[in-house]
Curated annotation (Swiss-Prot):
GO BP terms: translation
Family statement drawn from the similarity comment of this UniProt entry: Belongs to the universal ribosomal protein uL16 family.
Keyword tRNA processing recorded: no
Database matches in InterPro entries: Ribosomal_uL16 (IPR047873), Ribosomal_uL16_arc (IPR022981), Ribosomal_uL16_CS_euk_arc (IPR018255), Ribosomal_uL16_dom (IPR016180), Ribosomal_uL16_euk_arch (IPR001197), Ribosomal_uL16_sf (IPR036920)
Protein name: Large ribosomal subunit protein uL16
GO molecular function: structural constituent of ribosome
Keyword Iron-sulfur appears in the UniProt entry: no
Source organism (scientific name): Sulfurisphaera tokodaii (strain DSM 16993 / JCM 10545 / NBRC 100140 / 7) (Sulfolobus tokodaii)
Top-level taxon: Archaea
Amino acid sequence: MPLRPGRCYRHFSGPAYTRKEYIPGVPMPKITKFTMGNVNGNYDYELRLVALEKGQIRHNALEAARVLALKQLTNKTGSDQNFALIVLKYPHHVIRENKMMAFAGADRLQDGMRLSFGKPIGTAARIERLGDIIMIAKVKKEHLEIAKKAFEAAASKIPLKTKIDIVPIPKEAVVQ
């Protein structure tokens, strides 16, 4: 079966479904790297991708946003030593799907909504508070516009409304 659109899983109701020790067959999340670039570098600005609404972000959307931001930052700054990119949200929540058949005679083969709990098909990160930070990038002043464009592109992969906050990093904090 093909992957359902992200709008099917954007909103949530009820508690998170996270206990993987009780759930057989949970697929691994596509996103595996959460810190990229030179994390120990000396940077001037911190860019934050902030969620403006509550919802869920599927693991493949997080991975797509990460790959796009990383590729743009690496290609346009010249090296992965000129920035630090950190994904803060982890896809803990297990997403289920009650598969339905859609062909002639399917009503004789399936049970409809009887026993409709569903099988695990993926994972999602939950954004439960407004203003939660999804990703952070740290850059020097000369790469600020490049990082802003990379985050605008990455925000298009996230199924929620987002904004980009730019915070200058104080110099005394860097020295410590």
